[in-house]
Amino acid sequence: MPSTGAALVGALLWAMAMGASALTGLWLDNWETPEKIRFVVLLFAMGAAIAFPVGLFAARLASLDRHWEVALAAAFVCLLAATLAFTGGLFALQYRSYYAEWHAEAFTVRWAFELVFTSLTALYQFVVLGVRLYFPLGFIALAAASVWFARQQR
């Protein structure tokens, strides 16, 4: 079980790293709208902050009483999956809230279809357009966090 301090400090550092990665990607793409840049960076940072404790817990669970190689792989996979899942989920919520204005009344069959397909479209767009913002800094931070985790397990 990860300590509360490690989870909180790690979440803060992970959020800063993923936010910096998104900022670098947007800067390299020559985005010119500061409010949109701030929103995307905040989205990536919030997703990372929520994901880190979950990914850390899953990695510890997967690598319990195993060799350091397993701990390294578990941290890599669990942090990657949690970060993508939570950031993609936040993106889908924002995407859904934007398009909700044109959707049917809540809790109808049509609304349910619109909710599902809007969310799936948002996740698809995040995978296609958003994941690239994790390269190169996010990938380097992921490797560093995985090595840190594996060393902690020794």
Each model region followed by its residue ranges:
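Membrane-interface helix-boundary motifs at transmembrane edges
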Residues: 31-35, 60-70, 154
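Membrane-interfacial helical/loop segments at transmembrane boundaries in membrane proteins
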Residues: 96-121
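Hydrophobic alpha-helical transmembrane segments
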Residues: 113-139
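Canonical alpha-helical transmembrane segments
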Residues: 44-68
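Transmembrane alpha-helical insertion/packing segments
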Residues: 1-50
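Cytosolic juxtamembrane helix at the C-terminal end of the final transmembrane segment
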Residues: 136-154
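Hydrophobic alpha-helical membrane-insertion segments
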Residues: 73-100
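Alpha-helical transmembrane segments and their helix-start/interface "positive-inside/aromatic belt" motifs
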Residues: 1-10, 67-80
